[in-house]
């Protein structure tokens, strides 16, 4: 036994050992990822006829539109049919895009699936991703010169991809947030800072009454005073952090409202603050104006948002106009999210996905079905017994062992057929 353990140890040092469970789990994970990205897109029909598709899997062809040419994007079906042998950049998914394949941007290629297309799609938006460059560092992915392992995260607004270390704030664990808005988009859509104080995952804590907020992050900060600040006295106090802790900024808003008994108590101060907030909301009917009534901190960082945060955005007439002016109306569309797209793909795949074994059985007559089931049971039993020997001895199963098993199994099968043995063993 000791000798067997020693041999197994030497084998494990020479060869990477991967369990069958690991292989199956990795295969299932890759299949699920592919289904999530591609399942919501048609792999056989060009999407051009659908107009600007709300969200679809996209590719850019470096062979047809290299850097220096006009950027162009192609749908999933065209990536297979028209660009199968070309060098492609996988763009994951993008919103409101119409397939460019074969239009005027492609000098020597006509779309095989739908050749009759307009010269250009004026509604499409392009960025450096279409030339295989990502993030503010404008590097390819994967980057052969980058030795730092880092997750790439897509901004929900501009849809560019960013290295986590280039976002100005350390990303939370991937399961702790659903979407990210990059630094540039937070500057352009500055109204989001009002929501970030309440919703963003980068916010560390909000104490009982919402008057004291501790926000942790990296980057410059700008204190935004309340818009109805005539009756408020706002002060910014910076605490000296304890050694080994991150910098923490403490913002405290003091109310100088009409005096009341025990006005120095926290509960009375909370009541006054909430009443003023409710009055502001009832007058304007705008969630954003209510949030802007509180003191905020704007920082030069990206922000990370939880599941369903978009449903908290105000949809009053003024805010909807603002979203339109900023070209971010999609933020109010629950079906715009990548998660919604992925769920749509998973449902479609689950509906279409068939069991190969059951498909094969259904095409056979009764005798053939019985024979196939018997063969399957024989294979299952013998393979289990064969692998059990390796487990008992503590040795690693190699490629040659599996090849040997199937050779022996086929040999036994031939002997059974030659002997006219028409029953299950």
From Swiss-Prot:
Protein name: Putative E3 ubiquitin-protein ligase UBR7
Zinc finger feature spans (UBR-type): 44-116
Annotated metabolic or biological route of this protein: Protein modification; protein ubiquitination
Cross-link (Glycyl lysine isopeptide (Lys-Gly) (interchain with G-Cter in SUMO2)): 225, 252, 274, 398
Alphabetized SUPFAM superfamilies for the sequence: FYVE/PHD zinc finger
EC assignment: 2.3.2.27
Gene: UBR7
Disulfide bond entries: none
Enzyme class: transferase
Pfam families hit by this protein: zf-UBR
PHD-type ZnF: 132-188
């Amino acid at each position: 036994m000791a000798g067997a353990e020693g041999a197994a140890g030497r084998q494990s040092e020479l060869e990477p050992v991967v369990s069958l469970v690991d292989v199956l789990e990795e295969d299932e994970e890759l299949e699920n990822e592919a289904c999530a990205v591609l399942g919501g897109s048609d792999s056989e029909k060009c999407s051009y006829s659908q107009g600007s598709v709300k969200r679809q899997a996209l590719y850019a062809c470096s062979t047809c539109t290299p850097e220096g040419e006009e950027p162009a994007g192609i749908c999933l079906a065209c990536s297979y049919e028209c660009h199968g042998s070309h060098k492609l950049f996988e763009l994951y998914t993008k919103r409101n895009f119409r397939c460019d394949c074969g239009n005027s941007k492609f000098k020597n290629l006509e779309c095989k699936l739908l050749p009759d297309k307009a010269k250009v799609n004026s509604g499409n938006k392009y960025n450096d991703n279409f030339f295989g460059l990502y993030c503010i560092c404008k590097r390819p992915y994967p980057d052969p010169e980058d030795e730092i392992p880092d997750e790439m995260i897509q901004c929900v607004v501009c849809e560019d991809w960013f290295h986590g270390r280039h976002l100005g704030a350390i990303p939370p664990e991937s399961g702790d947030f659903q979407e990210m808005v990059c630094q540039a988009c937070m500057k352009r859509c500055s109204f989001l800072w009002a929501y970030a104080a309440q919703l963003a995952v980068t916010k560390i804590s909000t104490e009982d009454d919402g008057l004291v907020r501790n926000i942790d992050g990296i980057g410059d900060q700008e204190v935004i005073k309340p818009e109805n600040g005539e009756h408020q006295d706002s002060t910014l106090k910076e605490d000296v952090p304890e050694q080994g802790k991150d910098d923490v900024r403490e913002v405290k808003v003091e109310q100088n409202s009409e005096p009341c008994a025990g006005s120095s108590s926290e509960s009375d101060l909370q009541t006054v603050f909430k009443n003023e907030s409710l009055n502001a909301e009832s007058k304007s009917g705008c969630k954003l104006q209510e949030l802007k009534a509180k003191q905020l901190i704007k920082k030069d960082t990206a922000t990370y948002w939880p599941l369903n945060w978009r449903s908290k955005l105000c949809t009053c007439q003024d805010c909807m106009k603002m979203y339109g002016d900023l070209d971010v109306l999609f933020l109010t569309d629950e079906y715009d999210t990548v998660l919604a797209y992925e769920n749509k793909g998973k449902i479609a795949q689950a509906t279409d996905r068939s069991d190969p074994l059951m498909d094969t059985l259904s095409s056979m007559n009764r005798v053939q079905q019985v024979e196939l089931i018997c063969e399957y049971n024989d294979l299952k039993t013998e393979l289990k017994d064969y692998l059990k020997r390796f487990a008992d001895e503590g040795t690693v199963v190699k490629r040659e062992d599996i090849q040997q098993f199937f050779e022996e199994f086929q040999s036994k099968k031939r002997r059974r057929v030659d002997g006219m043995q028409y029953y299950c063993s």
